[in-house]
Amino acid sequence: INAGLVGSEMCIRDSNENGLLDYDNIEQIANLHSPKVIVAGASAYPRQINWLAFRQIADSVGAKLVVDMAHYSGLIAGRVYDSPLPYADVVTSTTHKTLRGPRGGMILWNKEEYTKKINSAIFPGTQGGPLMNIIAAKAQCYIEANTDEFKDYATQVVKNAQAMARQLEQYGIKVLTGGTDSHIILIDLSDSKYSGREAADILEKNGITC
């Protein structure tokens, strides 16, 4: 939860003992601090995020809602993960990761009042000359993401992750949240002889990136 675009800022990682987001507690925190902007998103949360709940929390305190969907954008394009676009004021994402595009990003918004501010903040604020090859690569990325083949791909990505989560549990490895709705699996290694870093190195050598 971001308490202001300029000024104090709070990062809230709120979940219950199962690792699931506790929206009631997030609402209590928002009511306590009255943020101007709430930023919702995750890099290590395997379940569906309730974007409507975040919208309602933001509205209850008069905050803007910004969503970072970088890790889920490909699954959202593939219609296997809920989209934040109907609920957020502004949405940001990378174009690589699950969207399979070139390294880069995008910003989406649904109100004309944001257009001038966002555009001027990007150029000339933070960006110089655009790379035309990257723009072309992004266009191709979006074309592919709008195909039935990409939807099939996204569906299979989630099925593969869910199958892996089940197998890990069968081998006695605790999977946080009890499974996954996405491409992300979180495991609890507190009772393991391996640290998180050691496990990540072993997995990377076998073609699985952590």
Set out the residue ranges of the language-model regions:
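Conserved acidic residues
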Residues: 9, 36, 89
